[in-house]
């Protein structure tokens, strides 16, 4: 009795210019020939079917025949793209039941643990857009309450198995990942060319900024094209031994992208979800050696050594299970790395380090060298303990810069002009003293409100870092924006609260990479 | 820095014929003058503001100027209605942050208990449509995991306080509620006229069917108008001492309606949420004496005496706290009550009982009398133990029927024709034996697939009940439908699995009302 009602006439597909993000949306007329719209309300779910092809969508109802007539069903942009059938095709539209895997989610809500088969079914339905927003939220929140280690392993395995699975013809495929939160922390763009110049394979995919003023992909985009598909990425890696591309077109762990799109608005952030997200992507990417950077600081994502330890163990446990050698380093996350925050400014810092320019940010150089050193030690041919010296040699000799240029050429020319925002003003110290702290969250927010990362030239250029002595009225940093109203807002906010703590203590020294 | 960006030009409101149900939806152009749509994705949240009036909405983006131009913002039907500003009004549109109360939801997800103030803030935001679907799901699921008794009391109080709060000029205001799940269980339409005929006040609001083939409001609608607003309802109660109206226009506990709209698609159903839903509505309705009917049976909502006990204690606890005298009766929920299932058939049964017609269903009559007896005992002037006799007297004498007629006249004429579906066929016994069980879930589904409650004349008319002897080929029930394809589907499903268990045991006897 739950079979589709095939005796009703099919509707013809029409495309509606509505970008509804992740959610599939279908529109029918209140006088539809194929459905009794009285039984529907807005945001019910319907099933569209052509032969064996099925799409689940959230329903909206219109009274406007110009939008959708009684014989039509309208598909929003993402639904139209995913269903991939031409306008005018005949499609059956029936009420949809929830995906069967939702029973497991309900059990999880009640406190049961899930089997690997149940988790695999959930991830499969997620990745194929069969869950509504609410249903995704239901899964995430039930899992946020508790996730057993067995559940976590099943989740990582299932997430890595849907979507692209890359394999490489060498046993040592290195990768690095930073859990984020630190402005200006663009070490990846220095580490990748060093490691590739040495001869280890490092096929790096990165994200665009989600809540920060720049991601590696946003910054790299100023130097080269980053929206490569899988085949194009493989060509670059085979030619250069490494790449710096955006993960968006490579489709590694698509379920993760979907989960993140709900975690973000709900600000859900549990260790297990972080580990599942990162490890599923690395597993799908074919990485075998992974270095993870945990910045620790009062305004970083990880605020204490205990928290870092727990998270490290979780990464190691999952890595061991899947045959990925995971190494976690805790780094100084008390302040931004480098000087620039925002894509253009960060690209400037990266190229200054790679080019051994005078005035290149020493902390960005030093951190990148230390991370690269860890990765180079994965090379069995390198004598133990010489990774740092080798990294420094590759950077100082210009080999890393040359490799970066090769990667840029292979990926293709950047589509973006690398211009700084035309509005700029300095934010000044309110008193004499020593910089004792820089609030990373605050600096991130200021750079975002100035327009970064959408406005590539917007952001913040730091003149002072922790330990620097400042005089009242001396500039702390410069705010850049490309848009007048964003500039006014960001500057006013920075002047109200700069994010700098200035007093007369001398800050404690912290080792950069543990 | 999170202040609205007032330096951007406002947009003008346009109305879009899209019924998006509970969710507020706003549409802007990808080339919008007031927003940088690049920073948005579909299903981001935006804040619309005119002076101090604010609406939160989920955003969709269009490339079609004919739908929404760069100077416009489109509001879906519910958003337009709720914002209540004319087409063409200038409105500022800015990115919306989540409601502040969502921090408490996040704490709850992490396992914290919430204060009364936090719960009140959540309910206030819910009732004012400030939560997205996902956010509502987040709250429900965090609460489904555990809800303390203090949290439950705070929830009931907060839910009852938003929306209409009815007060009556008498200390004894009786009410009844059935937790549902039993087909044909239309006792309310018999109990209300008996109790009102006696002289106790019983201002009854009922729901339409959500997952069953008929609600009291759907059935009553065949006899009288039910979509009364608060003032009209009060007039009926003052004139008749009781009413039988749909709760939808009375706006008791609007937060409950919103929670239910998410609980339903997720099939969330915890004791605490059931208690919060029912008790908040009764408190808002001004009820002081409440009788709750728990049908217990293998396919009922409550399947065991232990479960019934736990739920009863929870209702009593909340009732005591808010000064509502709650009495719970467990009733026989092993099979449907009466013969008809579906609005027209159920209205027929109700009127047969009220009219003392020969052949009126004895079980529906008996159960209604027993429930009415419990309610009549709330009258201090009635001698203890005489409630049943008094109820029977009011029914047998025709006083209850007369009262029903008075209520019908006061509420106004029914807008619906009371015609049975024109397609009908009998479902036959597959073997000789005795009816040992009737699956309530199955019967509900069959009646729904036949078209009930939307098709008022669709449903099932039972010829056999538990304990009846049947011969192979004898009709068990008749399926009615108004639509050919629904008829075919329902009949095929019924023939595949009738919902009747027939064997050679004699079923155990169960007392009707405990």
Curated annotation (Swiss-Prot), chains A, B:
Taking the record's annotation, the residue ranges forming a coiled coil are none
Per its record, the protein catalyses: thymidine + phosphate = 2-deoxy-alpha-D-ribose 1-phosphate + thymine
Q: Which EC number(s) are documented for this chain?
A: 2.4.2.4
GO CC annotations on file: cytosol
Quick check: keyword Nuclease in the entry?
A: no
State the top-level EC class.
transferase
- Domain of life of the native organism: Bacteria
Q: Which GO terms describe its biological process?
A: pyrimidine nucleobase metabolic process; pyrimidine nucleoside metabolic process
Arranged from A to Z, the UniProt key words for this protein are: Glycosyltransferase, Transferase
GO function terms (MF aspect): 1,4-alpha-oligoglucan phosphorylase activity; thymidine phosphorylase activity
Q: Which family does it belong to?
A: Belongs to the thymidine/pyrimidine-nucleoside phosphorylase family. Type 2 subfamily.
The protein in question is named: Putative thymidine phosphorylase
């Amino acid at each position: 009795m739950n079979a589709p009602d095939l005796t009703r006439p099919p509707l013809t597909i029409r495309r509606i210019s509505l970008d509804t993000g992740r959610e599939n949306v279908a529109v029918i007329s209140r006088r539809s020939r194929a459905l009794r719209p009285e039984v529907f309300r807005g945001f019910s779910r319907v099933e569209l079917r052509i032969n064996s092809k099925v799409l689940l969508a959230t329903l909206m109802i219109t009274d406007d025949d110009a939008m959708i007539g009684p014989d039509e069903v309208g598909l929003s942009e993402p639904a139209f793209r995913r269903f991939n059938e031409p306008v005018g095709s005949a499609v059956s539209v029936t009420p949809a039941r929830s995906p069967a895997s939702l029973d497991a989610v309900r059990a999880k809500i009640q406190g049961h643990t899930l089997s690997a088969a149940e988790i695999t079914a959930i991830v499969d339905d997620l990745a194929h857009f069969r869950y509504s927003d609410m249903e995704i939220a239901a899964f995430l929140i039930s899992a946020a309450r508790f996730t057993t280690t067995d559940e976590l392993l099943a989740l990582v395995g299932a997430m890595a198995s849907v979507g692209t699975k890359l394999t490489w013809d060498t046993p040592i495929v290195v990768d690095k990942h930073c859990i984020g939160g630190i402005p200006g922390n663009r070490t990846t763009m220095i580490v990748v060319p060093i490691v590739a110049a040495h001869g280890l394979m490092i096929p790096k995919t990165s994200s665009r900024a989600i809540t920060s003023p720049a991601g590696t992909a946003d910054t790299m985009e100023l130097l080269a094209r980053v929206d490569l598909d899988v085949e194009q990425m493989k060509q670059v890696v085979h030619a250069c031994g490494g790449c710096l591309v955006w993960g968006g077109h490579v489709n590694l762990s698509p379920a993760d992208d979907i989960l993140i799109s709900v975690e973000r608005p709900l600000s859900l952030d549990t260790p297990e979800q972080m580990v599942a997200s990162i490890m599923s992507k690395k597993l799908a990417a074919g990485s075998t050696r992974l270095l993870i950077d945990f910045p620790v600081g009062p305004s970083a994502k990880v605020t204490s050594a205990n928290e870092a330890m727990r998270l490290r163990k979780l990464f190691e446990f999952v890595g061991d299970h899947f045959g990925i050698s995971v190494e976690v380093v805790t780094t100084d996350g008390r302040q931004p790395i480098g000087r620039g925050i925002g894509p253009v400014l960060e690209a400037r810092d990266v190229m200054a380090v790679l080019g051994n320019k005078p005035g290149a940010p020493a902390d960005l150089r030093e951190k990148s060298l230390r991370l690269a050193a860890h990765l180079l030690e994965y090379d069995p041919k390198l004598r133990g303990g010489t990774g740092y010296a080798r990294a420094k040699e590759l950077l100082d000799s210009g080999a890393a810069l040359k490799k970066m240029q090769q990667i840029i050429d292979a990926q293709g020319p950047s589509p973006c002009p690398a211009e700084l925002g035309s509005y700029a003003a300095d934010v000044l110290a309110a008193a004499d003293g020593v910089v004792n702290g820089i609030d990373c969250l605050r600096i991130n927010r200021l750079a975002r409100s100035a327009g970064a990362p959408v406005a590539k030239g917007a952001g913040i250029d730091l003149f002072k870092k922790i330990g620097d002595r400042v005089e009242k009225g001396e500039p702390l940093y410069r705010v850049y924006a490309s848009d007048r109203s964003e500039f006014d807002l960001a500057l006013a906010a920075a002047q109200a609260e700069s994010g700098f703590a200035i007093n007369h203590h001398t800050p404690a020294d912290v080792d950069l990479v543990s």
